Amino acid sequence: MLVKNNQIAELEDTLIRNNIFEKFNLNRVGVFGSAARGEPSNDIDILIEDNVNYRSLAALRDELQSLLNKRIDIVIARYANPIILHRAMKEIVYVTKH
């Protein structure tokens, strides 16, 4: 697991400031890919381990894209391709509500 960087700190601040955890009933959000590694990127890859229906998932993605001005790719852990999930878990950084 990697450590929080500026991109993740910005995401965490946005999630907390906009009550995203409460609004979408999330306990934590995992960040993986280039954002987790601190590399420049125009998207953020997010792993959701909570039960989220597809309508809520689309609303979450749309709201985060609007707030962060970045493309958001969301993977739901229970439906994820095992190879993608394995790679994500190697570098995941979790953001939680405090």
For every predicted segment, state its role:
Residues 1-30, 36-41, 49-98:
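Catalytic core of pol beta-like nucleotidyltransferases
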